[in-house]
């Protein structure tokens, strides 16, 4: 999809995903157990639902999305201090090789 569509969809994305809440809770638990104490990069975070839930288990987490609208939504409200949201194109990651212990 084009970036502009994701920017437009950003304000309602989280509400749309609520129908799958039970599935997400299961996923949060599984992911959290795999990233304990690790430096983690998440690609395509959207509004940061996963990142906000699992980041407390990580040493540090950078959650990225190429949609500025999604990152704007992700930065709303409270989130762990070890979590950073960045607008980044997954095709052109600005990080050095081996900068992270895990990827989502």
How would you describe each model-predicted region?
Residues 14, 42, 65, 89, ...:
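Acidic active-site catalytic centers that drive phospho-/nucleotidyl reactions
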Residues 91-103:
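A short acidic, Gly/Pro-enriched loop at the edge of an enzyme's catalytic core
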Residues 1-35, 38-46:
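Conserved class I S-adenosyl-L-methionine
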Residues 39, 59-60, 84, 99-101:
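Structural signature of beta-strand start/N-cap positions in the alpha/beta core
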Residues 45-92:
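Class I SAM-dependent methyltransferase SAM/SAH-binding core
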């Amino acid at each position: 999809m084009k970036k502009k569509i994701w920017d437009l969809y950003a304000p309602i994305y989280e509400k749309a995903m609520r129908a799958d809440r039970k599935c997400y809770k299961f996923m949060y638990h599984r992911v959290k157990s795999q990233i304990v104490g690790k430096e983690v990069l998440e690609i395509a975070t959207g509004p940061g639902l996963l990142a906000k839930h699992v980041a407390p288990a990580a040493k540090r987490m950078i959650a990225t999305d190429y949609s500025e609208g999604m990152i704007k939504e992700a930065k709303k409200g409270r989130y762990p201090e070890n979590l950073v949201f960045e607008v980044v194109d997954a095709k052109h990651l600005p990080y050095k090789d081996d900068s992270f212990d895990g990827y989502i």
